[in-house]
């Protein structure tokens, strides 16, 4: 996970989020979906998914704004000094990173692509952690077919989140595009260790993902040498998350406000 996404995760229906009340436990779990959930957790252990059952009443889910209001209020009260831009990107990033990682991991590890419309994310002390999905048959097929399905799911989900957030926070479209792009490429970086993708493959796949989502150029990669001299990649982020404006914050190691040399120095220091 990237430094900014680690901060997020810590240790088409009506736009918005809803409190889930209508689900019922089911013994008829879908095996394809179960496999996808296992794959996701094998890459990111905190990405714990369940199918069926009833998620907590305060879970984030497409359809109404109640839980999103609570998320906004939590972070506004926790760090009022960080400002409006921090608040907007914090809420957006927290709401979208898990479904984005789930979809990208599914595509690259040959899993079936889940539908995101019914996804609910339990929230604890301001952090969505894990998720619930209704029992359903995810989309299988060739790599291209699964990538197209995943892009459509992510685009619909993220657009709905953004529509719901805009009345609540100061969210600019370009910044939102760039944060979404960062999450997608962060997921690609995370899954790379579980594949045979070369650096060139990762760069090409990153461009393909962002193009499929209509956010081309929103994030990229830069190459550097690790401490042992081996080539490495890091995210070339295009938007600052404003974490440094918090009373306990500092600039992320790959913050676009840092020079390239400073970003590389931070990455090397973190690896030591």
State each model region's role.
Residues 65, 262-263:
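Short alpha-helical interface patches
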Residues 257-262, 268-272:
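Short cysteine/histidine-rich metal-coordination sites, predominantly Zn2+-binding motifs
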Residues 107, 192, 253, 267-268:
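Short linear functional motifs in flexible/disordered or boundary regions
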Residues 1-88:
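Generic N-terminal leader/targeting and pre-domain segments
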Residues 237-260:
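Local cysteine-cluster metal-coordination motifs and their immediate loop/turn environment
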Residues 187-190, 194, 247, 258, ...:
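Hydrophobic alpha-helical segments
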